[in-house]
Amino acid sequence: MYIKLDIQTEFEVKSLSDLPNFKKLMGNLKMKINKSQLARELNVDRRTIDKYLNGFTPKGTKNKTSKIDTYYEVIAALLSSDSKQIFYYKRVLWQYLTDNHGLKCSQSAFRAYINRKPEFRTYFDEGKRILSGHSVGVRYETPPGEQAQLDWKESIRFETKSGEIVYVNVAVLLLSYSRFKVFHLNISKSQSVLMSFMTEAFEMFGGVPKVIVTDNMKTVMDEARTEHFTGTINNKFAQFAQDFGFKVQPCIAGRPNTKGKVEAPMKLLDEIHTYQGRFTFEELHEFVQKLCARINQTFHQGTGKIPVFALKQEKNLLQPLPKSAIRDSYMIKHKLVKVNTSGMISYKSNQYSVPAEYQGKTVGLQVYDNQIYVYHNMKLIVQHKISQSKLNYKEEHYKKALAKSLPKYPNIDNLAKQNLSVIGEVYRNEE
């Protein structure tokens, strides 16, 4: 398993509204802003540049925070499915908050606030309570190096460009302070895959956070945490946590509110569906890594930081990595093999195809969970299911190799399918 991070640091100022974010970026980089150059390029006065850099927003577009926002958590709890209390009217809720929580605002201001929040408005319009498992919950921040959040985007049905249906999973590990995250696409969610992924993610972070917040996934918890039971951590994962020096903090089953920071990237992973039928598995793997890099280089609205730059600040406060011998013991083993002249690699006396351009090159081989993963220079180039057949071709590999040897043949697609069918029958009879 390899994770490659491609970091770009260019930022284009197209208008005055870009200046606040530009100031944050330059602040992260500890670089001085050339206000005179900005004034010339945007064709405005230097004083205007100063004004926008200091947070000026044109009249009518300024986003004002409401003092009622401080009561968001209380309101969400009162209107949730866990609450036994019932509020038939907004006025009744306003009165309750005024009497019991010190709310100081007019009824009209309170009604307007509720109407601006769809999750609250539907309670009164349609009688729908806020589901506990999906409520926003308390917004809180953790100090640098303190916490990371772990989750899976599970069982994503994906159709490859060849028409094959695969169910893929994406693991996400996110540092809570910087919001820097690492994605990993895999068919498997096994414990060996999880621990190998986390090891490589820690290496990418440059250290280990003190706490890992997770749900009650079976690879971590033998028994789920509930409101009345602390849960039981799996022995092997407990040893992994001890070796790396972090504490496991499972969420209460069915109420993963404390894992809210990692939930937002899960929605971004829905971009995968826009490429249904367009990617091979290997191309999908590459897309997920590019998506992760893009998110890490984008301003985070909640923190006002760019995760990749905020990581530089957080890295110094992470715990040190354990010795390489410990880290290596959790990594999925990697073996170097050479691609033969037929564009195949060997595994246990059977051969598996790779793209034609890797013929004669040395590639990396990883085998786990009944799958073979082949890498070249940290890039996943092909994935095969382990088979008992002597020859195992991906149709697109065979087709390209055939087209190279028979460049003028009129219908390579049909010939490739016929040949592969014959090859399959020949070796099936020899088994």
From Swiss-Prot:
Pfam families: Mu-transpos_C_2 (PF22483), rve (PF00665). The keyword DNA-binding applies. GO terms for biological process: DNA integration; DNA recombination; transposition. Residues 35-54 bind DNA. PANTHER family: INTEGRASE PROTEIN (PTHR35004:SF7), TRANSPOSASE RV3428C-RELATED (PTHR35004). Involved in the transposition of the insertion sequence. This is Transposase for insertion sequence element IS232. It comes from Bacillus thuringiensis subsp. berliner. The lineage of its organism: Bacteria, Bacillati, Bacillota, Bacilli, Bacillales.
